[in-house]
């Protein structure tokens, strides 16, 4: 169990942000590798769905200047951040590169924005999701993860075949105590930048032993008191297609997370497990169709204008009371 997070770290719940507040999307980029293609694809995807908000790219100092210029040429707001490292520990992360992901915590310091949607660089947006920026304040919104892949082999959930995506299939054994709290995938989430939250995150990190899923485990621990699940249409982790197909209506999915081994479109060969599936091939092609569409390249006239004039969808008017644990998705139609 992690440290107790003081309630002062969170804003008061239950209010709606002012319509004129500055909002945006944010992603994270490190190094000189090919993930920059993912960010370019994401920028073009947000333009394709006519998002009213900018894409901020939080970059580490090791991102080369040519990649920064490429991102600016695609209309991105590039903000350099300093890396954050967890306390020294002998833990083996599920993936070695996860250690650098703690640097994502810097985005809570982007106080010029009242609310943001974080998206990993291997995500693509296929429907307009701007309405997520009008959800009630005081909560952390994200999609529940799946525990069925081998990267979870270290966990109690995996050891007994339990997954929160189908909690009645294998029930949590009484002898193991209470079931674990709901756990989200940190590739996409809705959050509120705040100096107080930012400082508390950094302080809590210094006294929290690292765990295999790095910043994702940490964020789950930290935001457990205010976490609200949202439908998987906002972050389709590809393993859901073969682990829980009964939970997926692919035609309604609005955000696809290309996080399965071999699924990054810019590296795709179809050789890895499950990558020869027709639905995977279709989703990879769908990403490339956006990436290669020159009409989606940034033009000066595309500059984000007048966020104050963005109209709130009727979706917000029908939101349940903030005390509920689930925010429904609007139709993808």
From Swiss-Prot:
SUPFAM superfamilies: Nucleotide-diphospho-sugar transferases (SSF53448). Gene3D superfamilies: Spore Coat Polysaccharide Biosynthesis Protein SpsA, Chain A (3.90.550.10). The keyword Protein biosynthesis does not apply. Mn(2+) binds at residues 120, 122, 257. Keywords: Carbohydrate metabolism, Cytoplasm, Galactose metabolism, Glycosyltransferase, Manganese, Metal-binding, Transferase. It comes from the Eukaryota. Belongs to the glycosyltransferase 8 family. Galactosyltransferase subfamily. This is Galactinol synthase 1. It comes from Ajuga reptans.
């Amino acid at each position: 169990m992690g440290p107790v997070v003081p309630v002062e770290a969170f804003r008061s719940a239950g209010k709606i942000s002012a319509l004129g507040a500055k909002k945006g999307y944010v992603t994270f980029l490190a190094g000189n590798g090919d993930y920059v293609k993912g960010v370019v694809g994401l920028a073009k995807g947000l333009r394709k769905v006519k998002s009213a908000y900018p894409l901020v790219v939080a970059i580490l100092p090791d991102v080369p200047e040519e990649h920064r210029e490429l991102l600016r040429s695609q209309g991105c707001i590039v903000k350099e951040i300093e890396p954050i490292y967890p306390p020294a520990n002998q833990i083996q992360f599920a993936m070695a590169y996860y250690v650098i992901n703690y640097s994502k915590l810097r985005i809570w310091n982007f106080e010029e924005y009242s609310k943001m949607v974080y998206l990993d660089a291997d995500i693509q947006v296929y429907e307009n999701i701007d309405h997520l920026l009008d959800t009630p304040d005081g909560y952390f919104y994200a999609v529940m993860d799946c525990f069925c892949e081998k990267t979870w082999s270290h966990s109690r959930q995996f050891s007994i075949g339990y997954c929160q995506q189908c909690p009645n299939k294998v029930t949590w054994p009484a002898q193991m105590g209470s079931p674990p709290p709901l756990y989200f995938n940190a590739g996409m989430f809705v959050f509120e930048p705040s100096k107080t939250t930012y400082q508390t995150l950094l302080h809590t990190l210094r006294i929290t032993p690292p765990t295999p899923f790095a910043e994702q485990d940490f964020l789950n621990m930290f935001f457990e008191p205010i976490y609200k699940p949202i439908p998987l249409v906002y972050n389709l982790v590809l393993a859901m297609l073969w682990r829980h197909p009964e939970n997926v209506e692919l035609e309604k999915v609005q955000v696809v997370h290309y996080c399965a081994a071999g699924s990054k479109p810019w590296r795709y060969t179809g050789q890895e497990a499950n990558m020869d599936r027709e639905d995977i091939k279709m989703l990879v092609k769908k990403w490339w169709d956006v990436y290669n569409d020159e009409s989606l390249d940034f033009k000066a006239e595309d500059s984000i204008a007048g966020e104050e004039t963005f109209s709130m969808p009727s979706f917000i008017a029908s939101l349940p009371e903030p005390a509920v644990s689930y925010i429904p998705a609007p139709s993808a139609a």
